[in-house]
UniProtKB/Swiss-Prot annotation:
Family: Belongs to the membrane fusion protein (MFP) (TC 8.A.1) family.
UniProt source species: Erwinia amylovora (strain ATCC 49946 / CCPPB 0273 / Ea273 / 27-3)
Region Disordered, annotated ranges: 35-62
Protein name according to UniProt: Multidrug resistance protein MdtA
Biased composition (Polar residues): 35-52
Description of how the protein assembles with itself and partners: Part of a tripartite efflux system composed of MdtA, MdtB and MdtC.
Listed GO MF terms: efflux transmembrane transporter activity
Membrane topology, record value: Peripheral membrane protein
GO CC field: efflux pump complex; plasma membrane
Source organism phylogeny: Bacteria, Pseudomonadati, Pseudomonadota, Gammaproteobacteria, Enterobacterales
Keyword Metal-binding: no
Amino acid sequence: MKTPRRFPLIALTVAAVLTAAALYWWYSHSTASTVQNRQGTEQQRASNSQGSAKRAGNAPPVQAAEALRQNVPQYLSGLGTVTAANTVTLRSRVDGDLVALHFNEGQEVAAGQLLAEIDPRPYEVALMQAEGQLAKDRATLTNARRDLARYEKLAQTQLVSAQELDTQRARVSETLGTIKADEGSVASARLNLTYSRVTAPIAGRVGLKQVDVGNYVSSGDANGIVVIAQTHPIDLVFSLPESDIASVLSAQKNGKLPVEAWDRNNKNLLTRGTLLSMDNQIDSTTGTVKLKARFDNQDDRLFPNQFVNARLKIGTLEDAIVIPAAALQMGNESHFVWVINGDSTVSKKIVASGLQGSGQVVISAGLQAGEKVVTDGIDRLTDGAQTEIVPAQASTPLPASGASS
């Protein structure tokens, strides 16, 4: 009776043990597979990373440019100051009260234009007096000549002595001299009256007025009435080293030399003109010589006392090899460039450089037209290394270029 009760209990126990064993087997195999997959993924990532690093180390990205053959203008550069072609301090030539000003400060004026008026009344009176004296002496001369004519007739009959006749002749000559002096006085008075109207001696731009209406002015005033500066045309005075004198003199034999005026930062071209003259002596203090260039300045890009950079063109270097200045490097003893070969490797080439400006440099020896030179990414290069050329617009910022020996 007791045997049937034990069989279900044993069966249940065996089933529970088998179920637990099955669950343990499934869990252990599932965990091992997951770990194995993760390890495989990490190994693949590490392999990819090492491969990328290896490729990056073998072929660093660089930017390059081709050496070009072209005509290169030859310039001499110097710092200069803009000066007015002519500068005049307008002064009154006569003394008197300033009654009117006929200009606005900063205005452009023409030669002969009325700019100021001095009280003319004293000079009008002086002119009237001079003219009156002249008229009086002319009447005296007329009367003296009539008396002389009568004396000459009477002398023929000896009714007057020779001495009286000579005296009358002297009186006529004296009156003629007086009239000459009177005519000079009239001319002087008329000129002074004209000077009461002050006109511009040159065309140009007036500055700030130095005196106000109502003040007494004279010809001895140091500041005058206003300063006029001629700015059309306008001049630029700049200096060059004495070593450049021979080049300038030689270039002048071929005609007028063009000059460019650039702003003080040497970035923007202001205007173009021509060389006007060169000083006849060297400044012994600075070892430089002064030159003067002239510009039409119709657009008023230049202003008196403005500091600008002058570029004097003395010739053209024909069929020169030109590369970007960033490609030229300085070694221990010489200049060099990195040249990209046909198999994308780089080689260091010693070169001789010439003129340099506007971001370009002339190579006088060591490089041929058409060769590609590295302009950026130079710090990463070694002789014979592989490179990858990338365009400037698509590349990430590269390390600053530097010389490598």
